[in-house]
Structures are given as C-alpha cells and as structure tokens.
Regions:
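Short alpha-helical segments that sit at the start of domains
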Residues: 1-5
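Nucleic-acid-binding surface
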Residues: 6, 15-22, 26, 32, ...
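Glycine-centered, phosphate/nucleic-acid-interacting loop/turn motifs that mediate DNA/RNA or nucleotide
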Residues: 40
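Single conserved hydrophobic/aromatic residue that forms the stacking wall/gate
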Residues: 198-210
Length: 210
C-alpha cells in the first residue's frame, strides 16, 4: 500500500480530519503529508490540523485540539450536563491565567481564566454531539463557576440551572460544598441552595465543610 493510500484510510477513520503529529506518528514524513494535503485539497483549519472538503466540522473538538488546556465551562458545561434547554450560541471555556485568549475571543469564544492550581478542579470529559471526547467541568464545578460569574450571565439561565441541579439524582452536595470553599462562594451558594428548596441540616453542612 502506498503512503497516499495509507493517508486516505487514515483520513476516513478520522472522519475527514488529519493532524500533522498524528500522521508523523504513523510513519509518514511531513513532506509526503504536505504533498498529500495539496493533492487532496485539504483545508488547513488550524496549526497542524487539516480537513477534507466533505468533513463535518466538530467545532468543539476542533477548539479542544487547538487549545488543549481549554476546558468547556459555564453555559457550555450546562449544555453538556443537560442543565439548560438551549444550545450555546457561543462556546465558553476556562484556561489557566497567563494564556493569551485574544485569538479565541476574536472568534467569538468566551474565555475565563483561573489560576493554575484551580484549573483542574472538577475536570472530567464529555462527548460532543459528533461523538468526540472533550474536557469539561463536572456538575459541581459548573455550579460554582456560575456563582462566581453570575453577574455576567442571564439571571434566567443561572436560576434555571440551579433549579435543575436541585432536582438531579446524581448531584453531590458534599463535593459542591467542598468546591464552594475552594472558590470562596460558600456563603452565596447556601443562599441559592435554600432558594432552590435544597435543605441541608446543620450537622450535614458541618460534615461537608470539614
């Protein structure tokens, strides 16, 4: 099998997307790959990432490939966790403090920054509508993020997410209170939890804080 045929197969298995690093790992040199890109008229959509003309673009996965430290958060995390009925009009991610978000912001991505030691708190993964795995914050981290940014989002979205979380059987109040302490939103969280009709007894609260 020739190298172009090998690349054709790889392109098919990767749903029309190829990455330079992936191709090199498969034993194909960059010059050969670039000849292939020109021959097959692949589109360069980001550094080291190429798409075929008929590829369905998974924008969330592409964003993840471009900026690996970007974690889907806030309203976008609500979408992944079924805490909103609306698909996000723009993606929201969180990156470590020090990363320059100007390019992402110019593309319409809402970017939050957080110090490095808190960036990985609540980090998990989820599947995009196209079936790709991307990083996203868990339910409890998402609630804390919403509390921290509540003045920058629609009150209806914020309150709706809290009410839906309150009804979730998989909610973890102990973890939620632990995160709230780390992000310094514990006091305001208790107020909103009470409004959402979640009643935590005082002994349980003390156990969750400790």
């Amino acid at each position: 099998m020739g190298q172009f045929e090998q690349l054709d197969q790889l392109l098919e298995t990767q749903d029309g997307m190829l990455r330079t690093a992936q191709v090199v790992s498969a034993g194909i040199s960059k010059p050969v790959f670039y000849d292939y890109v020109h021959s097959r008229e692949l589109e360069r959509v980001a550094h080291g990432i190429y798409l075929s003309k008929d590829a369905w673009v998974d924008a969330m996965y592409l964003l993840h490939l471009r900026v690996e430290q970007a974690v889907f958060s806030h309203e976008t995390a609500l979408f992944f966790h079924d805490l909103t009925d609306r698909e996000p009009l723009e993606y929201t991610v969180t990156v470590k403090t020090g990363y320059n978000p100007s390019k992402l912001k110019a593309e319409g991505v809402q970017v939050f920054t957080i110090k490095a030691e808190l960036h990985g708190v609540g980090l998990t993964t989820a599947q995009t509508p196209f079936g790709h795995t991307v990083p996203v914050y868990d339910l409890e981290r998402t609630i804390c993020d919403l509390l921290r940014s509540r003045n920058n989002m629609e009150m209806q979205t914020f309150q709706g997410a809290l009410k839906m979380y309150a009804r979730r059987k998989d909610k973890d109040l102990r973890t939620l209170m632990r995160y709230a302490g780390m992000f310094r939103v514990e006091k305001i969280l208790r107020q909103y939890l009470e409004l959402s009709l979640i009643h935590i007894s005082e002994p349980t609260r003390q156990a969750e804080i400790s």
